[in-house]
Amino acid sequence: MKSLLTLLLLSTLALHGQETTASADKTTFEFKDGDRLVLLGNTVFEREQRYGAFEPRLALALGETKVSVRNLAWSGDTVFGTARSYFGPPEEGIQRLSGHLDMLKPTVAMLCYGSELAFERLQGLPDFLTGYRSLIDLIRAKSPGVRIIVVAPPPVESLQPPLPDLSTENKNLSSLRDALRKFAMMQNAFFVDWFELMGGLPKPGLATKPLTENGVHYTPAGYEKLAAKLVQGLGLKIPEAPSPALENLRQAVIAKDTLFFNRWRPQNETYLFGFRKHEQGQNAKEIPMFDPLIAQG
């Protein structure tokens, strides 16, 4: 049975009667039918599941090529995975991620890391790149043949006081972008310059039409632009689609992402799998029951 998302996509394509295929040049990432795309990163990727902006546009751009998308991003995460740790040592975080990679077996992994370095004057950049390489090695070990996409973090914004001027941080992000471009080449990974696509180094002064709520975290309108530019950075073109049809796709994606979030980050996990599972551990068997619901989404 075709999923709800697939049916909505086909209806949308039929409405505007356009067909889109990715070009074969070197600036285009080639998706294959049936690809399993996993998003890995920190807050900018994690919050995408709130807005459902990226996946509908990717689906429209790919046309008949069907790609599933699963969001494994985690707010505050770094390439070392420490934010993912619960009650154990910091290393537990990367072990947790390893288990989720085992579960999903991605054929494509899109990673966006490093924004925190902009606020640290790029201190620790060598260690960051070493950790990034180790993370990619882990992904490749879990999913041999996986294709890697490295995404440069988008810019931050300088807003009205008392919020700080983030001009220096944007210069740091520009330098980080340059380092990530070289890193991606060395890793035989596709590179997306999200920083430049979102405007690059802004002009001096305050943002006149801000896309963030505080200079760092993007608004719903910001995510609309982020999503469109990310698809563009993959070398794909998004066909025109009627607003109601795109909204239907967006709602279907948000529903699917909510189900998946409850699958891999369930509430009260301590009772399900942790040190209190003896109290309610019998409920752990219900977590895999999300899988068929997610597949239909």
Predicted ranges, named:
Residues 1-7:
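Sec-dependent signal peptide recognition
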Residues 9-17:
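Hydrophobic h-region of N-terminal signal peptides that target proteins for export
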Residues 17-75, 90, 97-105, 109, ...:
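Serine-esterase "nucleophile elbow" of acetyl-processing enzymes
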Residues 19, 32, 186, 209-297:
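Conserved catalytic region of serine esterases and O-acyltransferases that act on ester linkages
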Residues 36-40, 68-73, 107-113, 147-152, ...:
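Structural recognition of the beta-strand scaffold that forms the well-ordered cores
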Residues 40, 50-52, 89-129, 260, ...:
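Oxyanion-hole/transition-state-stabilizing segment in secreted/luminal serine hydrolases
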Residues 71-92, 119:
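Acidic/histidine-rich helix-loop elements
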Residues 158-194:
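Substrate-gating cap/lid alpha-helix
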